[in-house]
Regions:
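Acidic, His- and aromatic-enriched active-site or binding-groove loops in soluble protein domains
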Residues: 55-83, 111, 119, 143-215
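N-terminal regions that are enriched for targeting/export leaders
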Residues: 1-50, 57-58, 62-70
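A short acidic (Asp/Glu
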Residues: 46-52, 96-98, 132-143, 155-156, ...
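Catalytic grooves of carbohydrate-active enzymes
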Residues: 196-285
């Protein structure tokens, strides 16, 4: 059995270099179009090493230029169209780490980011925690490192509501009733929606499960409260989009099933399609 670490990277030359920039460039006529992309620090380190070593005739030289360019483009509101969000250096599951370790993972990531994109945008204020692994226990560490928002699987928004229609088919145990402190969305103008035309074994709440919310950690010793914004990552839609994108995910058909609940202009629904590049074999040349 032969295996080449270098070849694994070479097979992903497109997504590691220009594909994200190219996708955003195709939509520059749209006022708000953009994307958030995450690199582990160790992957950045690998790509820098490939460039420094002149691998394959220097094919990795300036691999970071596309991200630099994409980060220089702004939306009509002045936000970067390509946001390289914060991440742990070694792809850590942050809820399993202590506060010092979490902060060091982010600091190391900031360090290699600054080394790689010397003239690029300032470090992102948002984070995609590896594997979307989140716990309120990590909030103080994130906030201490200047992180304002975090992507959270939106099934956890739903599970924290009264009358959540749990099913074992979701792959999760029933929620702790003590955690269900939010009102039933269906009793407040929303609904529990059973999505069709994609794998979605549990109902989703609309609009609640698709709206950013403040989340907080209360220090059990001091009572000090630390808050940040949780951005809902659309669990089932992101999974389907990552599986195959156009053709696999029927965007309009699925989103039309809850768009009628997008009635609060001050707190609009926010459908984030989050996924890992290599899942289901995608993301390679």
């Amino acid at each position: 059995f032969s295996f080449s670490v270098v070849d694994v990277h070479n097979q992903r030359f497109g997504p590691y270099t220009t594909w994200p920039r190219d996708a955003i460039q195709a939509g520059l006529s749209q006022p708000h179009l953009g994307a958030q992309i995450s690199f582990t620090g160790s992957l950045i380190e690998n790509l820098n090493a490939l460039a420094a070593g002149g691998v394959n005739g220097g094919m990795w030289n300036n691999w970071d230029a596309g991200y630099d360019q994409g980060g220089s483009w702004t939306t009509t509101l002045g936000n970067p169209r390509l946001d390289l969000v914060a991440f742990g250096y070694h792809h850590p599951l942050m809820p399993l780490l202590d506060e010092q370790d979490i902060r060091m993972q982010i600091r190391l990531h900031k360090h290699i980011y600054a080394q790689t994109w010397t003239g690029g945008p300032t470090y992102s204020r948002g984070i995609f925690p590896a594997e979307t692994a989140f716990s309120e226990r990590i909030i103080p560490a994130l906030v201490a490192e200047g992180i304002d928002w975090v992507l959270v699987d939106n099934i956890h928004f739903d599970r924290a509501c009264l009358n959540y229609p749990h099913t074992n088919q979701s792959g999760l145990f029933a929620p702790n009733a003590a955690d269900q402190i939010n009102p039933d969305p269906a009793a407040n103008g929303g609904a529990w929606v059973q999505l069709n035309n994609l794998w979605a074994p549990s109902q989703v709440s609309a609009p609640f499960g698709y709206q950013p919310h403040y989340v907080q950690y209360v220090n059990p010793v001091t009572g000090a409260i630390t808050q940040m914004i949780a951005v809902p990552a659309a669990r089932y839609e992101g999974n389907e989009d990552g599986r195959g994108g156009y053709g696999a995910f029927l965007y309009d058909v699925v989103m039309d099933q809850y768009i009628q609940y997008n009635t609060d202009a001050a707190h609009p629904m926010f459908v984030v399609l989050h996924h890992d590049g290599d899942n289901y074999g995608g993301g390679t040349d």
